[in-house]
C-alpha cells in the first residue's frame, strides 16, 4: 500500500522490490513492465504474540491471496516481468520452531509453479524471552528444521529476517521515578518516560521486565503499576510489577529489551520529547 512513487524510486535505486498484489500491475503497467520482482504471498494463516502482529490470513492486509497467484503470474507474464523471489512473513514472536519449515514447504510449491524463483524469503518473527516465564527460543531446533526442509528443496536459497531476535536484548529504556502514589489499594510509580518512548506495552500489551536500579539490594516484593506521564489510560509500562516497597521519586529505573521497536517507534505525542539514544561501545558511551 505504499505510494506508487516509492516503487519508482526503489527501481531507480536498484532496490530489490517485493510486490503484494496484482492491482499494482494493472493500474501502473508502465512502472512494472520488464521488471524483476519478488512476490509476497499470504499463505492463508498467521501467528504471533498478539493479534496486531499476526500478518497472515484474510484479516491481514499483507500479501497476495494464495488463490490469486495464477492471476498474478498471468499479469506479470503480459508485462514481461520476472519473479525471482517469494516472500511470506506471517507474524512476530512465533514460538513454534516448525513454523518456518512449513513456510518453506508451502512457498516451494508456488515457486515450482512459477518456474523462475531463486529465493524463498521466509520472513522473521523469531521471539525472545521478554520475561522469566518465557521459554528461550530453541535456535538449534529451528536451524535443524530449516536444514531438513532445505534438503527437500535444494533448488532455492533461503532468506530470513531476524531483526528483533538480534537487537531486542541489546537496548534498554532508562527513566527516573517521578511520583509514587497509592490509590484504593493500587500502588503506582510514575516515570519521566511514557508510551511515546516505548509503545509496545500500550500497543501490544507486551511485557517488559522493569528494575529499580537504585535499590538492587532491596527485596522486589511489592506490586506496582508502572506508568508514564501521558494523558492516555494505556500509558502503562507494566501492571503488578514487583519492585522494592520503598521505591521513591528520583530512583533510576530500567525497562529491559527495548532494542527492537523502541526508539524506531518513538514519537513526540503530548509534547513529550524523544528519548536520547546512547550507544555503548565496550562500556564507553557514544
Regions found by a protein language model. Give the residues of each.
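Active-site-proximal beta-alpha core segment in soluble small-molecule metabolic enzymes
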Residues: 1-119, 128, 134, 145
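Conserved beta-strand positions
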Residues: 19, 88, 122-124, 160-162, ...
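Acidic/histidine-enriched ion/cofactor-binding microenvironments in catalytic or ligand-binding pockets
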Residues: 31, 109-119, 137-144, 148-153, ...
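Flexible glycine/acidic-rich beta-alpha junction loops that bind and position SAM and/or redox cofactors
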Residues: 46-47, 118-134, 159-171, 197-199
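Short glycine/threonine-rich loop-to-helix capping motif typified by GTGT followed
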Residues: 96-103, 130-142, 168-179, 240-243
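Contiguous, function-dense segments enriched for cysteine-driven chemistry
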Residues: 116, 133-149, 153-162, 172, ...
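Charged (often Lys/Glu-rich) extended helix/loop segments that serve as interaction or gating elements
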Residues: 156-286
